[in-house]
């Protein structure tokens, strides 16, 4: 079933501007509370001006341009401006340091970068090292340097026409983006995403949450992440909704922002749900218009119940990864939700649980979650310049090996167990880190928890828990281990625990376990 119908991203924005005109498309709020707002027509003009800016800097179809930006309207301008001229966006995680960023520039052969003044010192050093093809930087911000090879984004953009001046032939099969995975266990891989992928993501994710043009979708997810792009921005724009993009997440400000913009849909990762729950209860907790809160894994049943009871919201689960583009397994609009299931497979996909010999498993048995889609359309096209890695993950028939463990029940509901690489081998037993984290997170004194395996000469691996306590709480080792012994099998009880003030996380809120081993 082809729901895209041959429409590329240039056509999408021209059509949206014509259909919705003065309707609000994008609202952005900075950390300082400064709000910028754009209609569909004016946003399309900003995108066109940005496309012309890139053309004036020598960018043509097929060229790659890197973005290293926190959430801002300019990210949206650049993303779709590049797509309109057939160029390719390479977003860089805004939390990466110099060596990691230089590696992405080198491996994607990027010569032009758009970034903000706060990141410029790092990229000035990268240019001086001559270790990458980077030769020009377009800067966003005030008090900009007058260095060679540096241009001012706002000044250049303001001089451009609102009418597109370069319109090469585009196909939905053309690459629109190379999105490098977070690389928490190894060097990141460049996930190649096409125009079709992004258009499909818009329609699919809008269907998943029954999005309409009178909805307001608010997110704090980073724009350089697949979630913000394909689960929030693309569906919001595709449905003609209003997309609210916040610069950063603040637990104290979140509900005020939900009410301020009358958001009807938002999304939360477990860290957000936990930090929202430790905020003081208020009479306004249920005074909002939210009808759906999308969330992603690693939430205990008690946490889910407490959150929905306090704030009067529905949680909609969705499972996916960068390579799947969207949440290919999840709750369906109007469907019964079967906690702790991650839902059922969405339209246009197939899903199976397979064993180590790549054979399908019956209901109830744990194996690898495998997804069948169409490369370059409903799942990613390939890993950029890595054919061997592509072949390992993606079978010729379109079956994608996720590397995640799970099972399905007799009714076709799927259940996530853990990342296969996130299992601890302890004395012959496989122990799921997620299972232990869900159990331990129910302790009333614990705000956050992560479990890792550490080397053990006798039992392969020992289990260590890193915990963050709620403000003002104390927890002894005796109390912690007693709680574990009363709530899990003996072989699953951690051998060590360590109290931290915080846990290392990447841009999407995922804990970076390699930094704890």
UniProtKB/Swiss-Prot annotation:
Which InterPro entries does the annotation name? AMP-bd_C, AMP-bd_C_sf, AMP-binding_CS, AMP-dep_synth/lig_dom, ANL_N_sf, CaiC
Q: Which SUPFAM superfamilies match?
A: Acetyl-CoA synthetase-like
MF annotations from Gene Ontology:
carnitine-CoA ligase activity; crotonobetaine-CoA ligase activity; medium-chain fatty acid-CoA ligase activity
Q: Which UniProt keywords apply?
A: Ligase
What Gene Ontology terms for biological process does this UniProt record contain?
Answer: carnitine metabolic process; fatty acid metabolic process
Q: In which pathway does it act?
A: Amine and polyamine metabolism; carnitine metabolism
Give TM segment ranges: none
Source organism superkingdom: Bacteria
What is the E.C. number?
6.2.1.48
From the UniProt record, list the coiled-coil ranges.
Answer: none
Q: Does this entry carry the keyword Transport?
A: no
> What PROSITE patterns does the record tag this protein with?
AMP_BINDING
User: Does the record's keyword annotation contain Ligase?
Assistant: yes
Q: Which reaction does it catalyse?
A: 4-(trimethylamino)butanoate + ATP + CoA = 4-(trimethylamino)butanoyl-CoA + AMP + diphosphate; crotonobetaine + ATP + CoA = crotonobetainyl-CoA + AMP + diphosphate; (R)-carnitine + ATP + CoA = (R)-carnitinyl-CoA + AMP + diphosphate
Identify which top EC class this enzyme belongs to: ligase
> Which Pfam families does the UniProt record give?
AMP-binding, AMP-binding_C
Question: Member of which family?
Answer: Belongs to the ATP-dependent AMP-binding enzyme family.
State the protein's purpose.
Catalyzes the transfer of CoA to carnitine, generating the initial carnitinyl-CoA needed for the CaiB reaction cycle. Also has activity toward crotonobetaine and gamma-butyrobetaine.
Q: What is this protein called?
A: Crotonobetaine/carnitine--CoA ligase
Q: Name the gene for this chain.
A: caiC
């Amino acid at each position: 079933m082809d729901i895209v119908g041959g429409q590329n991203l240039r056509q999408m924005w021209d059509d949206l501007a014509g259909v919705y005109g003065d309707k609000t498309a994008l609202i952005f709020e900075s950390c300082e509370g400064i709000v910028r707002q754009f209609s569909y027509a004016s946003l399309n003009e900003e995108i066109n001006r940005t496309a012309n800016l890139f053309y004036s800097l020598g960018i043509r179809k097929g060229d790659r341009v890197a973005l290293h930006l926190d959430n801002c309207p300019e990210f949206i301008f650049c993303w779709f401006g590049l797509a309109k001229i057939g160029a390719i966006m390479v977003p860089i995680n805004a939390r990466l340091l110099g060596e990691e960023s230089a590696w992405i520039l080198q491996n994607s052969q990027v010569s032009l970068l758009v970034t903000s003044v706060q990141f410029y010192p790092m990229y000035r050093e990268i240019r001086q090292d001559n270790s990458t093809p980077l030769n020009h930087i377009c800067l966003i911000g005030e008090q900009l340097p007058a260095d060679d090879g540096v241009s001012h984004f706002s000044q250049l953009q303001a001089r451009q026409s609102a009418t597109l001046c370069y319109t090469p032939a585009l196909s939905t099969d053309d690459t629109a983006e190379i999105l490098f995975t977070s690389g928490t266990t190894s060097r990141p891989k460049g996930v190649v995403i096409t125009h079709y992928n992004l258009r499909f993501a818009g329609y699919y994710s809008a269907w998943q949450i029954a999005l309409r043009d009178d909805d307001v979708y608010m997110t704090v997810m980073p724009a350089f992440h697949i979630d913000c792009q394909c689960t929030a921005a693309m569906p919001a724009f595709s449905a003609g909704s209003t997309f609210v993009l916040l610069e950063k997440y603040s637990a104290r400000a979140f509900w005020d922002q939900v009410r301020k913009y009358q958001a009807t849909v938002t999304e939360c990762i477990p860290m957000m749900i936990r930090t929202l729950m430790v905020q003081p209860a208020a009479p306004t907790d249920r005074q909002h218009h939210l009808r759906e809160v999308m969330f992603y894994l690693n939430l205990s049943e008690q946490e889910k119940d407490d959150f929905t009871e306090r704030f009067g919201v529905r949680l909609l689960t969705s499972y996916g990864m960068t390579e799947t583009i969207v949440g290919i397994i999840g709750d369906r609009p109007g469907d019964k939700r079967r906690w702790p299931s991650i839902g059922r497979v969405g339209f246009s996909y197939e899903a199976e649980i397979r064993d180590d010999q790549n054979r399908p498993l019956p209901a109830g048995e744990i194996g690898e979650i495998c997804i069948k889609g169409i490369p370059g359309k409903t799942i990613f096209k390939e890993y950029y310049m890595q054919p061997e890695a592509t072949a390992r993950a993606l079978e010729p028939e379109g079956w994608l090996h996720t590397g995640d463990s799970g099972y399905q029940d007799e009714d076709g509901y799927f259940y996530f167990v853990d990342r296969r690489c996130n299992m601890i081998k302890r004395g012959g037993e496989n122990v799921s880190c997620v299972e232990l984290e869900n159990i331990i997170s129910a302790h009333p004194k614990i705000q956050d928890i992560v479990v890792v395996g550490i080397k053990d000469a006798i039992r392969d691996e020992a289990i260590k828990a890193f915990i963050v306590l709620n403000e003002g709480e104390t927890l002894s080792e005796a109390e912690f281990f007693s709680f574990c012994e009363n709530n899990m099998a003996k072989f699953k009880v951690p051998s060590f625990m360590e109290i931290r003030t915080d846990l290392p996380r990447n841009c999407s809120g995922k804990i970076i376990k390699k930094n704890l081993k």
